[in-house]
Amino acid sequence: SPEGFYYVKDGIDQAISRGLAYAPFADLIWCETATPNLEEAKKFADAIHAKFPGKMLAYNCSPSFNWKKHLSDDEIATFQTKIGMMGYKFQFITLAGFHTQNIAIFELAEKYKKEGMTAYSRIQQNEFAREKDGYTSVKHQREVGTSYFDAVSNTISSGKSSTTAMEGSTESEQF
């Protein structure tokens, strides 16, 4: 290429070749497909397992796939079970948090424009309701470790720090 790279022929055969080359040295082998494709996933898994039985595989249930364009609702619902049976033990969605955060804040912005603080308060009430299920981010200062940094500051200053954040904070008083 003009940048000095070598061109390679991509595709499942090249992925299998690389997977087999790395298998002796890797804990698990990851194959990236262009679409959510069970046939390619099986071909890759079968080829790796033929030479390395039981080798764990990884599959990116990618946000770059238009899932509904390629699969029915039933196929989407069973996709992970099916690849799991092929040996794909590590299944993940790259950038799931990115997409989830962005659609959530976009929807909040739309509602905030129309409803003002009521829109945000509704989200906050949902956070409170979800604490019983293990949700912990209501107390955002705690979540980001503010108490830890307060302890470090107090340790360094022999308990005389004037820049701590938690003691007397709105979070400690209201939540």
Please describe what each predicted stretch is.
Residues 102-118:
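C-terminal helical cap(s) of enzyme catalytic domains, especially alpha/beta-barrels
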Residues 116-167:
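Flexible C-terminal active-site loop/helix
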